[in-house]
Every structure is written in structure tokens, then in C-alpha cells.
């Protein structure tokens, strides 16, 4: 469902814009659609036709998304496996300090080699109301003051629905614009569209390396854009909107954590209006990638910080409960990594 469909359904039962606005705000707070306020009961505000017609609309909205399972983690995060109306599932993560990570697609077409979500490919887009429904569900559990589009999917590949959800969350959802974070691998359309929006979100760019050839290997179906050009575009956006870019770097032991890479990262990012989030890879059994040691991660952070790059370590939330993006859904949906299966079969043949 799209947000416009929701609004049209409300208009069809006689809701005026002022009524639709109140219903929007109630839903995005995680409240019933007919919730009143401290100063005015719903029966004193909504006309009879709206009060009588809300129940079937509320039932449709409830079917958009439901919590299939909850997984509490030791770090204070709460991973939610969210079931959609057609039986598909996506992940949302309630983060410490009132944040929420939401999904924008079922699966993903980019196929990042270190990401579980890409193993299944792209199954379908989420509608704007399905994206917002993740926020409504989460707010029934605890406050949400920041929403990051870093869950399943590439937001730029579902641009219209994501931007519609951002507009809604940044107005009726009462979330500050810089607390809405649009994450992308570097789709050129992002840098054209986002500056034109009324609600201009913060931007997170998937960098992962300073080497164009390695980035093509790690992100095989991402736009062919050199890391230096990506940073240049990010810097221009950051200066325009007035809040820093987040650069994402998933640390893979022996792949992109060398001293040579860190030297290049320092040269590329020093003095830029941004922060580098280094994310130690969330290893899974039998995977070809491994996370660097804690000592190496801290050494990288210190080195970059000492060389003029604001650097933070961002572990995937919920390391003890399938913390990497897509891992929880993969376990529930029995998603198989074909390359890992082939390696196991080859190992079995060799052993025989």
C-alpha cells in the first residue's frame, strides 16, 4: 500500500485534511487511528461517517505489517522480524538511544558479497505505507526519534516509496530531518533528488574501500563510481544541507583492513564534513569473510582519528541474535547461500 491510497481511503469516508492529519499522527505514534488527544476526544472531533468508517481501514493498515518474532540482544537493541501482508518478511531493528533501522525492499539487487540480504536477490519493493508501518510497530514497543534506511534493500532502487515515507515521517511522524538517514551504494539519482526535497534527510554512503577495483568486487551490481567521486558528491550534499555525511566501511579481515587502505582512507576523508563508520563484519559459520580482531579494529580507529578522520566503530546491532543485515530473515526463510553450499560440497568430495 502507498500512503496516497491510505489518504484516499480516509477521504472516501468523509475525512477532511485536518482529520487525515490527526489520523496520520496517531498511527505513526503507534496509536489506534481514532485516538483522541489530551484535550479532545475522538468523538468530539471526527464526524460520524469517519468514526463508522475507520474500522475497516484500520484492519487494512494492521495487515500491512506485523511482528513475526522479537529477538532481544545484549547490546540493548531489539531485532524484529516483520511479516508483511503477502507472507514475505523483512527486518527492523530498534537501536539503543531511540533509533530504528528499517527495510525498504524484500531482498536486494545490489548483491554485496558480504551481505546476507543480497543472497536471495530482489523479491519486491515495499510500499511507502509498509515502510512507515515498521515505525508504527516499533513505536508500540519504545520511542523512536531516529530512522535509518539501512535495513534490507537499496533505498535508491525504491526511490519514490522511500522518499514518500521520508516526507511523511519528517512531518506527521515528528522526526527531525537530520534524524532520517538515507543510505545508498551511490546511485546518481540520490544526489539529484534529495537536495530538492522539503524534508532533506541525512545521507549515508557505502564506501567500504578506496580502491575502485575492489569496490566493484565487493559491490558487483552497484553503480560504477570511483570512491573519490562518491566522497566528492557526499561532501557537496553535506555542505548544502548542513549535516555531515556518514561513510560506511564494513571491515573484512585481509580484504580492506590493510595499512595501505587506511593510509588512502585518511588522505581521502581528512577534512571532509563527515564521519567514517567502521563496521566489523558479522561473521557466520562457513563464510569466506571474517571480522578483524578487536585489537585491529581499535588500532584502525585510533590511526584514522589521529590522522584527521572522525571515526566511529559501529557493530551491527544484535551481534548475538543474527545481527548482520538479512541474517534473521535468512534463518526464518531458509535462504541458502549457493556459493557456500558449493564450497561445502567440494570439501566433501575432497574429503572422500
UniProtKB/Swiss-Prot annotation:
Co-factor: note: Binds 1 [4Fe-4S] cluster. The cluster is coordinated with 3 cysteines and an exchangeable S-adenosyl-L-methionine.
UniProt keyword list: 4Fe-4S, Cytoplasm, Disulfide bond, Iron, Iron-sulfur, Metal-binding, Methyltransferase, S-adenosyl-L-methionine, Transferase
One Pfam family hit: Radical_SAM
Principal place of residence: cytoplasm
Keyword Glycoprotein: no
Enzyme Commission numbers on file: 2.1.1.-
Disulphide bridges: 101-325
Occurrences of domain Radical SAM core (ranges): 94-320
SUPFAM superfamilies according to UniProt: Radical SAM enzymes
Biological processes per GO annotation: rRNA base methylation; tRNA methylation
Active site: 91, 325
Residues annotated for [4Fe-4S] cluster binding in this entry: 108, 112, 115
Compartments in which it is found: Cytoplasm
Superkingdom of this protein's organism: Bacteria
EC class name: transferase
The keyword Flavoprotein belongs to this UniProt entry's keyword annotation: no
InterPro entries, A to Z: Aldolase_TIM (IPR013785), Methyltransferase_A (IPR040072), rRNA_lsu_MTrfase_RlmN/Cfr (IPR004383), rSAM (IPR007197)
CC cofactor: [4Fe-4S] cluster
GO cellular component: a single term: cytoplasm
Residues that, per the record, bind S-adenosyl-L-methionine: 153-154, 183, 206-208, 282
Protein family (similarity comment): Belongs to the radical SAM superfamily. RlmN family.
NCBIfam families hit by this protein: PRK14464.1
Protein name as it appears in the record: Probable RNA methyltransferase CV_2253
Classification of source organism: Bacteria, Pseudomonadati, Pseudomonadota, Betaproteobacteria, Neisseriales
Amino acid at each position: 500500500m502507498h500512503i496516497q491510497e491510505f489518504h484516499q481511503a480516509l477521504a472516501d469516508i468523509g475525512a477532511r485534511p485536518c482529520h487525515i492529519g490527526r489520523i496520520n499522527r496517531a498511527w505513526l505514534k503507534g496509536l489506534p487511528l481514532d485516538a483522541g488527544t489530551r484535550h479532545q476526544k475522538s468523538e468530539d472531533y471526527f464526524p460520524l461517517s469517519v468514526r463508522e468508517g475507520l474500522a475497516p481501514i484500520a484492519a487494512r493498515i494492521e495487515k500491512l505489517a506485523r511482528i513475526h518474532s522479537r529477538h532481544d540482544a545484549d547490546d540493548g537493541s531489539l531485532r524484529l522480524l516483520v511479516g508483511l501482508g503477502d507472507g514475505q518478511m523483512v527486518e527492523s531493528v530498534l537501536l539503543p538511544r531511540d533509533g530504528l533501522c528499517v527495510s525498504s525492499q524484500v531482498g536486494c539487487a545490489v548483491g554485496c558479497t558480504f551481505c546476507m540480504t543480497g543472497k536471495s536477490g530482489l523479491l519486491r519493493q515495499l510500499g511507502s505505507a509498509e515502510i512507515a508501518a515498521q515505525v508504527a510497530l516499533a513505536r508500540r514497543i519504545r520511542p523512536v526519534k531516529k530512522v535509518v534506511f539501512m535495513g534490507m534493500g537499496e533505498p535508491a532502487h525504491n526511490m519514490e516509496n522511500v522518499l514518500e515515507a521520508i516526507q511523511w515521517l519528517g512531518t506527521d511522524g515528528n522526526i527531525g530531518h537530520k534524524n532520517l538517514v538515507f543510505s545508498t551504494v551511490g546511485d546518481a539519482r540520490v544526489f539529484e533528488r534529495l537536495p530538492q526535497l522539503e524534508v532533506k534527510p541525512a545521507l549515508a554512503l557505502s564506501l567500504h574501500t578506496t580502491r575502485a577495483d575492489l569496490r566493484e568486487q565487493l559491490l558487483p551490481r552497484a553503480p560504477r563510481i570511483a570512491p573519490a567521486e562518491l566522497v566528492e558528491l557526499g561532501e557537496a550534499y553535506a555542505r548544502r544541507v548542513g549535516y555531515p555525511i556518514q561513510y560506511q566501511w564494513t571491515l573484512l579481515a585481509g580484504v580492506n583492513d590493510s595499512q595501505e587502505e587506511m593510509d588512502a582512507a585518511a588522505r581521502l576523508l581528512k577534512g571532509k564534513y563527515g564521519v567514517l563508520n567502521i563496521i566489523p563484519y558479522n561473521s557466520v559459520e562457513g563464510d569466506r569473510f571474517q571480522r578483524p580482531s578487536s585489537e585491529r579494529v581499535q588500532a584502525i580507529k585510533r590511526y584514522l582519528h589521529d590522522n584527521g578522520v572522525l571515526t566511529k566503530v559501529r557493530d551491527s546491532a544484535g551481534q548475538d541474535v543474527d545481527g548482520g543485515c538479512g541474517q534473521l530473515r535468512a534463518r526464518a526463510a531458509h535462504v541458502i547461500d549457493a556459493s557456500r553450499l558449493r564450497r561445502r560440497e567440494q570439501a566433501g568430495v575432497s574429503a572422500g
